[in-house]
């Protein structure tokens, strides 16, 4: 029932925050590949958007032939291999069948540390010379496998991240990805729309209020100002919340909510073009930051820092930024993480921030 297609087509499992069920989508034919968000249909599908659209990472619109919803309680019984009588029940593997739990890191940490330091130095120089106000610098970690069940990982992410959007998708064009993200890019409830400015990161410590540096506060304020400016002229009845703290796994972020209405259905496409990528995953000025990322980062982001989710699918639009995510191949899981670099940033502190973010997904393994 939960097998992903092995050749052609597409399959998606997704769970929206604080719900007790997930949705399964299956398309029997190949998903539509789009050149730009300008071409994005406005209803009836699931969007998979990369950080930058290219031939290697196309923008996909999945039009499901099958849509089904499954209570988490029933899924848990199947996912753990326990049937109603408590005996072992078969569990269908995803297209990554043959993978196992990670035995070791395939990424040499010393080499990765050096690559990150060089990337940071280049990015930081751009900031100090006034080319950029902020830049998000990311890296990735390869972990070897040999028998992993992606469906079980999806269920584990649903349980450990109740406030996150959790998605598992597979297509021939993208491969298999698992995302557990706290950041909505654009979501709809009735006639009301919602997005957030989410930035600034400190470790979560139980019963200890987080302390925010001026760097973290300004980093988040940059994102909030950007989003407010992009909503100007397209959003009606705009309400901006006070900045507050939100927790996602082992880390805390600063968050500002924006709630509004849109005048026309086509404004959804226009707003996505305005918002993606936000300074929370790219930087400012946006075009210059995007070019710096492509020049300075040691590895391509692929679908990390893009977004995915249902768009006008049975009346539901929930598009979330692909922050905490991992990509599966028959031999590796590749985990992605990044952090905002400011003129006052310290390389060691930024490295440690990416380490904490990687732990969010590593703990699932």
PLM segments and residue spans:
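An anion-binding catalytic pocket shared by soluble metabolic enzymes
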Residues: 5-25, 139-222, 315-338
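Conserved hydrophobic core element of enzyme catalytic domains
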Residues: 266-365
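An N-terminal JmjN-like helical accessory module and its immediate linker preceding a catalytic domain
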Residues: 1-39, 43-55
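Cytosolic ligand/metal-binding cores
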Residues: 25-27, 41-43, 73, 184-252, ...
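Structural signature of FAD isoalloxazine-binding scaffolds in flavoprotein oxidoreductases
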Residues: 58-74, 318-328
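Terminal domain-start leader segments
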Residues: 1-23, 93, 98-150
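A glycine-rich phosphate-binding loop feature that marks nucleotide/adenosyl-phosphate handling sites
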Residues: 171-177, 228, 243-251, 307-310
């Amino acid at each position: 029932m939960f097998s992903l297609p092995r050749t052609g087509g597409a399959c998606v499992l997704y769970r929206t925050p604080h719900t007790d069920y997930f949705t399964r989508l299956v398309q029997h034919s190949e998903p539509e590949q789009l050149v730009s968000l300008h071409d994005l249909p406005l209803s009836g599908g699931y969007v998979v958007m990369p950080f930058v659209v290219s031939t290697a990472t196309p923008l996909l619109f999945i039009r499901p032939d099958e849509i089904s919803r499954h209570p988490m309680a029933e899924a848990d019984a199947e996912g753990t291999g326990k049937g109603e009588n408590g005996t072992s029940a078969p569990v269908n593997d995803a297209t990554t069948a043959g993978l196992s739990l990670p035995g070791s890191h395939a990424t040499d940490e010393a080499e990765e540390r050096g690559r990150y330091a060089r990337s940071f130095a280049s990015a930081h120089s751009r900031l100090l010379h006034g080319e950029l106000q902020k830049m998000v610098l990311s890296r990735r970690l390869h972990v070897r496998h040999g028998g992993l069940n992606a469906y079980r990982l999806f269920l584990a992410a649903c349980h450990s991240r109740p406030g996150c959007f959790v998605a598992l998708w597979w297509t021939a064009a993208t491969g298999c990805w698992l995302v557990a993200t706290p950041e909505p890019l654009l979501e709809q409830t009735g006639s009301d729309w919602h997005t957030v400015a989410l930035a600034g990161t400190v470790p979560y410590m139980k019963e200890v209020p987080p302390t925010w540096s001026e760097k973290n506060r300004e980093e988040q304020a940059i994102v909030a100002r950007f989003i407010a400016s992009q909503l100007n002229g397209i959003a009606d009845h705009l309400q901006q919340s006070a900045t507050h703290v939100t927790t996602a796994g082992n880390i805390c972020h600063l968050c500002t909510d924006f709630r509004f209405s849109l005048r026309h259905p086509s404004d959804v496409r226009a707003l996505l073009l305005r918002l993606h990528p936000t300074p929370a995953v790219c930087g400012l000025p946006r075009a210059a930051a995007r070019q710096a990322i492509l020049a300075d980062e040691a590895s391509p982001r692929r679908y990390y820092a893009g977004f995915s989710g249902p768009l006008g699918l049975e009346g539901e639009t929930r598009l979330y930024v692909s922050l905490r995510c991992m990509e599966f191949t028959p031999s590796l899981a590749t985990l992605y993480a990044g952090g905002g670099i400011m003129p006052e940033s310290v390389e060691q502190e930024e490295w440690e921030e990416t380490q904490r973010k990687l732990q969010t997904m590593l703990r699932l393994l």
